[in-house]
């Protein structure tokens, strides 16, 4: 997973849990049942886990380009 993929995964899990929480709260408030809110947030968390935990291809679209290492010559000790 690259840096852009991490950013996308973070957006997905945050918005998934928030949307499921808000919808669950509204339906739970209308029905006067707190368990609906709890199960809605649990479902959102589970869906978020399925979407974000595996390293899907959509999270690996911007691979890192590493620089070549700089080879430094070892200093010689002339004081001996």
Curated annotation (Swiss-Prot):
Assembly: Component of the signal peptidase complex (SPC) composed of a catalytic subunit sec11 and three accessory subunits spcs1, spcs2 and spcs3. The complex induces a local thinning of the ER membrane which is used to measure the length of the signal peptide (SP) h-region of protein substrates. This ensures the selectivity of the complex towards h-regions shorter than 18-20 amino acids.
Gene name per UniProt: spcs1
Cytoplasmic side: 1-9, 55-80
Transmembrane segments: 10-30, 34-54
Bilayer topology: Multi-pass membrane protein
Cellular localization per UniProt: Endoplasmic reticulum membrane
Keywords of this entry: Endoplasmic reticulum, Membrane, Transmembrane, Transmembrane helix
The protein's role, per its UniProt record: Component of the signal peptidase complex (SPC) which catalyzes the cleavage of N-terminal signal sequences from nascent proteins as they are translocated into the lumen of the endoplasmic reticulum. Dispensable for SPC enzymatic activity.
InterPro entries for the chain: Spc1/SPCS1
GO-annotated cellular components: signal peptidase complex
One BP annotation, GO: signal peptide processing
UniProt family annotation: Belongs to the SPCS1 family.
Name of protein: Signal peptidase complex subunit 1
Record bears the keyword Transmembrane: yes
Membrane side Lumenal: residue ranges: 31-33
């Amino acid at each position: 997973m690259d840096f852009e993929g991490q950013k996308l995964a973070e957006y997905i899990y945050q918005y998934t849990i928030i949307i499921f929480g808000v919808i669950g709260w509204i339906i739970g408030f209308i029905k006067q049942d707190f368990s609906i809110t709890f199960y809605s947030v649990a479902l959102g968390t589970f869906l978020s886990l399925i979407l974000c935990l595996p390293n899907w291809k959509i999270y690996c679209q911007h691979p890192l380009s590493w620089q070549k290492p700089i080879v430094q010559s070892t200093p010689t000790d002339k004081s001996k």
